[in-house]
Amino acid sequence: MARPPLPLPPPLHGAVFTFDELDDVGVSRYRVRAADVERLGRGLFRHHPSDGSAPPRRTSVPWDAEVAATLLRDRLDAVVSDLSAAQVHGLPLPAWAETDGRLHLTVARAHRIDRPGVCTRRRAVDRRHLVIRRGLRCTSPIRTLWDLCAPSSGLTFDDLVVIADALMPQEWVEGFGLGEVRVGTRDLTAVLEEMGRFRGVRRAREVAALMREGVGSPQETRTRLALLDAGLPVPEVAAVLTDDDGVAGPTVDLAYPRWRVVIQYEGARHRSVRQQERDVERDRWCELHGWLVVKVTARDLRDGLRNVLPILRARIAASA
């Protein structure tokens, strides 16, 4: 009967490791031939303890975070970036990007990390643009946004504006916000200028011109951009309405004060009893003071605001 393999020391027990890390703890490289070690790729292994005592894996991202951590230990110039960094930070992404299982890394040196499922890009990343999230060295949320402006990201222009808006303060929306990743307009533009010339910089500057603070959801961003695509002016965001005496009224998603038009996106958060009460109060105030409330749904966005635009244009024509 074959003898059971010698136990691995605590740093490698139930972990992903490299040959160098095996050497560091004084264990023979032949140990990887045992049945409890899985080969993940060239020089990369995972230990599967026979007693089931492996620590729980991090599963909040669609790629193997333990493999990522090991690669970052092996390559100190590597950082998690692009779509993978966006996933770590919880930035709003289209469905296909949320589930992208490739591990995106940026390296400073010419030698790429050639492994299945790993996409590497060679570019310099300023230390000021690095953060530690979930134990992984990542590009900061702002740097991640601008890196994603490269055509290779696969994201559309609207997707990028959604991310930029999501990074902005959203304090006017009770119970909504991204917490630790919220920053100000100046922070976003400052990092963009620090990066200088890079692939996608023109698109990044166009995103910066259209990003807005105070946006409550990705759908509100897409509504604003759809209005712009339809040839209408950019509406005010998180607008505070006032009556004829200048007394402040409700705060609304989008507004055209010149034509007294309010545009509200009706998303999931409007289904709570408390929010419905606020919506009724807002609509009554608007009706009393001559403001038209136009509500937009997910179907309207899918249809390109086909049923919304005639209402807005009729209001504008009547006010001319």
Indicate where each model-derived feature is located.
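Short gly/ser-rich loop at a beta-strand->alpha-helix junction or flexible surface loop bordering the NTP-binding
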Residues: 1-200, 320
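Surface segments flanking catalytic/ligand-binding clefts of nucleic-acid enzymes
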Residues: 1, 10-16, 21-29, 171-320
